[in-house]
Amino acid sequence: MSEMDYYEVLEVSRDCSGAELKKAYRKLALKYHPDRNPDDQEAEEKFKIVNEAYQVLSDDEKRTIYDRYGKEGLEGQGMGGGFGGANMDDIMDIFNSMFGGGGGGFGGFGRTRRDPSQKYALDFEIELPLAFNEAVFGCEKKIDITYKTPCEECGGTGAKDGKMETCDYCGGQGQVLMRQGPMQFAQTCPKCHGEGRKIAQKCPSCQGKGYHEETETVTIKVPAGVDSGNRLRVPGHGNEAKNGQRGDLYLTFYVEEDEHFIRNGNDIYIEVPVFFTQAILGETISIPTLDGELELELKQSTKDKEQFIFEGEGVPDVHNGRKGRLIAQVRMILPKKINEEQKELLEKLQESYGVESRPHKSTFESAFDKVKNWFKN
């Protein structure tokens, strides 16, 4: 991977925008981060080159030089890859958003940095399926969760009797120096993850993990109007730290589809089957709504797929409670079979409108003539 073009490393096109670049970097940094891939040398190397590529391409000056002269041009200017420069804050923001805590309500994770000696993130996320009506009206649900708690026998270190020894990879510093061309930068040690120490002998109780898993039942109040992809923070129900404090639980909702209603944001769509005679003559019919039913007035000659909009009959907005629209769309129903009496009545109706019985010959005369002319030459 180290021989690849920087754009190929980040899996983006050469004309990608800054936002596209940042999104691609976030995805790959999360995928190859040492915390997610302990003792994986290949992931560690990929993580380094992903950071190197982003440091170059996210800097306008470096990117211009790289586009013209390649990596050699950067080294000739003393502008190799690696951490440093204006984008370090950008990178830390991304890491904090991926691995931090804090935050509140709906949205992403916060920016609390993790203690290097902590074997796991305190915040974690699970998916919570909801029935269609539970999401629309809100509900209270009891869910069982599994969270991590420090191993009492080793004090959460993962080492037998809590005995640790100096990390031989970073010499106990918790960081290692990396070099890219003339530049060098410090990176969290991938072996000890910044702690500066390593396990001498695994704890027999937790097998070196530093934690055990516990289960608990949590009552969740789901607000009305949530939709698939919305996230809810539940403070104090994440993993437990060594000091006894707990992180936060994040719930990502997945809303099941309904048999009749189709949701689009806060709007609700429903298909209304209408017999063709009802559409022609006009009629007032009852249709279901989220709260019950209402009357839909079909005017004479209502068209197939015609829509009728009812304001305030949709889903309440999860933030302000304002309801969306109910949109009823007509689906014309035609009879599959007719008897002789019905056929006779329909033919009389057709004649009363002056409709020609044989494929509208007069209507298509000019078209027939045009087609004949195609074959004359």
Curated annotation (Swiss-Prot):
GO cellular component, one term: cytoplasm
Binding site for Zn(2+) 1: C151, C154, C203, C206
UniProt subunit comment: Homodimer.
GO MF annotation: an example: ATP binding
Manner of cofactor binding, per the entry note: Binds 2 Zn(2+) ions per monomer.
UniProt xrefs under SUPFAM superfamilies: Chaperone J-domain, DnaJ/Hsp40 cysteine-rich domain, HSP40/DnaJ peptide-binding domain
UniProt xrefs under SMART domains: DnaJ (SM00271)
Family: Belongs to the DnaJ family.
Residues annotated as binding Zn(2+) 2: C167, C170, C189, C192
CXXCXGXG motif repeat residue numbers: 151-158, 167-174, 189-196, 203-210
Name of the protein in question: Chaperone protein DnaJ
One Pfam match: DnaJ_CXXCXGXG
Domain of life according to the entry: Bacteria
Comment on protein domains: The J domain is necessary and sufficient to stimulate DnaK ATPase activity. Zinc center 1 plays an important role in the autonomous, DnaK-independent chaperone activity of DnaJ. Zinc center 2 is essential for interaction with DnaK and for DnaJ activity.
Source taxonomy: Bacteria, Pseudomonadati, Campylobacterota, Epsilonproteobacteria, Campylobacterales
UniProt-listed CDD domains: DnaJ, DnaJ_C, DnaJ_zf
GO BP annotation list: chaperone cofactor-dependent protein refolding; DNA replication; protein refolding; response to heat
Co-factor(s): Zn(2+)
General function of this protein: Participates actively in the response to hyperosmotic and heat shock by preventing the aggregation of stress-denatured proteins and by disaggregating proteins, also in an autonomous, DnaK-independent fashion. Unfolded proteins bind initially to DnaJ; upon interaction with the DnaJ-bound protein, DnaK hydrolyzes its bound ATP, resulting in the formation of a stable complex. GrpE releases ADP from DnaK; ATP binding to DnaK triggers the release of the substrate protein, thus completing the reaction cycle.
Keywords carried by this UniProt record: Chaperone, Cytoplasm, DNA replication, Metal-binding, Repeat, Stress response, Zinc, Zinc-finger
Primary subcellular site in the record, as a coarse category: cytoplasm
Domain J: 5-70
Residues in CR-type zinc fingers: 138-215
Native source species: Sulfurovum sp. (strain NBC37-1)
